[in-house]
Each structure stands twice: as C-alpha cells, then as structure tokens.
UniProtKB/Swiss-Prot annotation:
Keywords: Repressor, Ribonucleoprotein, Ribosomal protein, RNA-binding, rRNA-binding, Translation regulation, tRNA-binding. Disulfide bonds: none annotated. One of its GO terms (molecular function) is structural constituent of ribosome. GO terms for cellular component: cytosolic large ribosomal subunit. Part of the 50S ribosomal subunit. InterPro entries: Ribosom_uL1_bac-type, Ribosomal_uL1, Ribosomal_uL1-like, Ribosomal_uL1/biogenesis, Ribosomal_uL1_3-a/b-sand, Ribosomal_uL1_CS. HAMAP family: Ribosomal_uL1_B. SUPFAM superfamilies: Ribosomal protein L1. The gene is rplA. Belongs to the universal ribosomal protein uL1 family. The lineage of its organism: Bacteria, Pseudomonadati, Pseudomonadota, Betaproteobacteria, Neisseriales. It comes from Neisseria gonorrhoeae (strain ATCC 700825 / FA 1090). PANTHER family: 54S RIBOSOMAL PROTEIN L1, MITOCHONDRIAL, LARGE RIBOSOMAL SUBUNIT PROTEIN UL1M. This is Large ribosomal subunit protein uL1. Binds directly to 23S rRNA. The L1 stalk is quite mobile in the ribosome, and is involved in E site tRNA release. Protein L1 is also a translational repressor protein, it controls the translation of the L11 operon by binding to its mRNA.
Length: 231
C-alpha cells in the first residue's frame, strides 16, 4: 500500500492542480506518469455541450485511428455466402450465421467487435440481451451493420474505436498506449476530435467542446486547454 501512495504522490507532483495544459504537453505528462509494469492505455474524455437526455443530441460513431490502438482486436462476423468468404479474407476471427448465434448463447464470446450484414440482423436481434450489455450489439451508426462486411473487418483490425456520449454528455475513448510516440498519440487524438466535432448535433447550442482531459490506466488525469486543440 505504501508503494502505491508513494507512486501517487510522485504523479501528483508532476501535474499542477487546476492548470490547463496544451494538448502536446498533456500527452507528454501522461506518458511520463505511466509507470505501471504494463503498457497502460492512454485515454481521453471530451465533456460536450449536449443534452444526452434528448435523442437528437446523443453522439455515437466510430473512427479509425491512423496509428492504431496498440491492441489486437478479435472480430466476429454474422454473414453468409460470398460475404462470409470476404470477411475471412479480410481477417475476421470468427464468421458464421445460426451456428455463431448458438456459440454465443452457449457463452462463447471471445471477441471484441461484432459485425453483421443486414440480412443477418434477424438472427443477431435475438442476441440483444447478451450482446447489448457488453457493448457488442452491431449498429449501422457505428458501421458494424453493413453490406460491406470485409471493409468493416479491415477497419476494426486497423484500429477503429467507437465513441458515444454517456448520460452526462461525456465521450470516453482510448487513443493508444503509453509506449506510443507522443506524435502518434497526438495524431490519434486529432482524428478522434475531428470525428466528434463533425458529429456535432444541429440542436446543440452554446459551447460544444467544454472540457478535455487525457489520462492513462493507472495515472492521473491531465486537463487540456481547449484552445490548444484544433476544433
């Protein structure tokens, strides 16, 4: 316990409370503070000026990070026929139809992303109570229900991340690992920010990008000066 306290004390000393840092400096501080014995993820949160209680202000989508996520993504695809072969060639880990649904009902969910062709949704829809709570339910808004399953598989494997506002209007997402170069994390950050800015609801009023923070799995959060990001 003493080691944890000492580590946290060192981390806190490197970040000034209530100070807003330029995004480049924030990323550098987070990398420096990521001293755990594993490769910590680097995460970002965007506090947006939206009312998530209103359906027309819920932001949801996906974006392929140019430098990837630093993790291996296992992809399952519900499809059949030529689409099944295309999905396999694109790198899907599991491809099936009724047989895949049976495996999932049996508790076999060894994958991170589920993709489905439109014709498969009659089967996938029956798995809502299993896939939904795990955030695995395919959705056309994030590109996981699509006739072009091969492209969706390639995107997932290339480092696609999904984002969605929570009840407080905050988007949480991972932009890489602490082992990434600062420039690579910044490039991923910019790609995610660009997607979120483009997704701004027409009904959203006032300041859209209210607060931004960057953190690592075991480190402290660093608040970002929103004027330092290109929005």
């Amino acid at each position: 316990m003493a080691k944890v306290s000492k580590r946290l004390k060192v981390l806190r000393s490197s970040v000034e409370a209530n100070k807003l840092y330029a995004i480049d400096e924030a990323i550098a501080l987070v990398k420096k503070a990521a001293t755990a014995k594993f490769d910590e993820s680097v995460d970002v949160s965007f506090n947006l000026g939206v009312d998530s209680r209103k359906s027309d202000q819920v932001i949801r989508g996906s974006v392929v990070l140019p430098k990837g996520t630093g993790k291996t993504t296992r992809v399952a695809v519900f499809t059949q026929g030529v689409n099944a072969e295309a999905a396999k060639e694109a790198g899907a880990d599991v491809v099936g139809f009724e047989d895949l649904a049976a495996e999932i009902k049996a508790g076999n969910l060894n994958f991170d992303v589920v993709i489905a062709s439109p014709d498969a949704m009659r089967i996938v829809g029956q798995l809502g109570t299993i896939l939904g709570p795990r955030g695995l339910m395919p959705n056309p808004k994030i590109g996981t229900v699509t006739p072009n399953v091969a492209e969706a598989v390639k995107n997932a494997k290339a480092g696609q991340v999904q984002y969605r506002t929570d009840k407080a209007g905050i988007v949480h997402a991972t932009i890489g690992r602490a082992s990434f170069a600062e420039a690579d994390l910044k490039e991923n950050f910019d790609a995610l920010l660009d997607a979120i800015v483009k997704a701004k609801p027409a009904a959203a009023k006032g300041q859209y990008l209210k607060k931004v923070a960057v953190s690592s799995t075991m480190g402290l959060g660093v608040r970002v000066d929103t004027s330092s990001v290109n929005n």
